[in-house]
Structures are given as C-alpha cells and as structure tokens.
C-alpha cells in the first residue's frame, strides 16, 4: 500500500497544468446489520485497513475522462513511477489504472466504497477490480490553493440536486450530510437493526465528515482498469 499519491495534469493554476498530492486515507466501515443475536462484537477484519504502515509513492498522469456518476467521476491514468522502500515496483503494476474521484459532497461515500473493496480483497482481480488504495487531502494543502481548479470537478454534468434525494426532514439527527443507509435513525424509538458494537464506525474520521465549500476534500480510489467503456447501447453489433 502506497502512502502518497501524485497525480500530474489533475489541476490548473492560472491556466497552467498542475499536480496534486494526496495521502493514503482510512476507509469508512459500515455498521453491522443484525437479524438476531444483537450486540455481538464485530470481527477485527470489519474495521478499516490499518494505513499506518503504508509507504512509498505512486505517481500517475491523468489521461481521459471515462464517465460521470452520482457520487464521482472516473478517469484513466498512466503509471509514471512507483517506489516503495527505494525499490522500483512499477513492473508489478499495469501501465494504466482507473481513478474514481469523489465529487465535492461525497468523499464520505467514497470512503465507504473503499471499505467494501477491502472487505472483498480475495475477489480482487477475479470478479472485481484490483484495489490499489484510497487517498484524500483537504484542498487547502494543495499548492496554488485557492486559485487551483481541480480538473475532475470541472464540466460537471449532474449537480448535487440532480443526483440526490431531498434531505431527510430529520437530517440534523444524522452524523453527516453525506448520509448513508446505516445513518438512518430508528423509527419512532424502535430498535435499529444497525449496530456498531466495536466502535469502528463512530471512531472513524469519516463519521462526522461534511463538505466544506471553502476547503473541500479531494478523495480518489485507485483501481485496476478493466475492459471497454460500457456505452449502454444494445443491439446485435454491440458485444
């Protein structure tokens, strides 16, 4: 696991291309859904992966935009360099990877997606893409801030209002505006099926994360790049 991610051509400052630098970040664990036997402790593997021992730097160059979704935007990126313990590990990586950047409002949700990749690690490279890490940083830490224009956030087709349901009436009871299904409070005092007996969720730095307009969080998942782009087209000529 790399501790630092550099992405070239990922921003502009005064019209000139600029790089961004992100640090490895813990993912955001889910609560546990109990059908019965409530209060059981969560297994240690349920927690986010320990990133304290991460080392090395992965350097990429942003290439082409793939697609925009509800919470993020995907790009291809070229692997420029990969060093760990002063050893060049680039030969162990593909030439090109996939980057999924969170939109400004959804870094918490992307942190949860990173946790799912950690949980299904044995399936990586088999039925799901290989996960190379989750990285994030406050925008204020980037050189050129606040005059930096972050490329993945430009030309946004779908706004927050277009892709998100109306906030719940009791959103003030939720730990974050970027709420997830396990944030929903119990209905009228009924016991919730979602529990956090081991504290993994509430102890996460993402538990009360919220989007800050003056200093948004940049976050990205680095994944194996799979096959051709899915166009949504159907027909005998489309495989």
Regions found by a protein language model. Give the residues of each.
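Juxta-kinase regulatory segment immediately upstream of eukaryotic protein kinase catalytic domains
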Residues: 1-68
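ATP-dependent kinase catalytic cores of phosphoinositide-metabolizing enzymes
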Residues: 2-6, 10-13, 17, 25, ...
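Short, charged, low-hydrophobicity "junction" segments
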Residues: 46-48, 105, 196-200
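Conserved structural core of kinase catalytic domains
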Residues: 121, 128-238
